[in-house]
Amino acid sequence: MFDYIIVGGGSAGSVLANRLTSNSKNKVLLCEAGPDTPPGKVPEQILDTYPGYAYLDKRFHWTELKVSTEVKSHNMKDEDQIPLRKYEQARVLGGGSSIN
């Protein structure tokens, strides 16, 4: 049983989990969609000072997310007229800060 469940181990989720656990009575579950990273086993791509290695590694980001960047007009006949663009989101402990 947990007192708090935090979905997303990005910058905000990780900081929130840390602050909540400053009270040892709180039981906190931090969920992240990325690969499991045991303590002391952070992948070299994440630790590297050049973020491109982590950014290009498909384990650390969603590869198929797309989003419309245009407003749908009431005059449009079908949704295929709205172009979709790649939507880059990290899936690693630390979120986008780990791969940018």
Task: Label the model's feature ranges.
Residues 1-100:
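N-terminal redox-cofactor-binding region of secreted/periplasmic oxidoreductases
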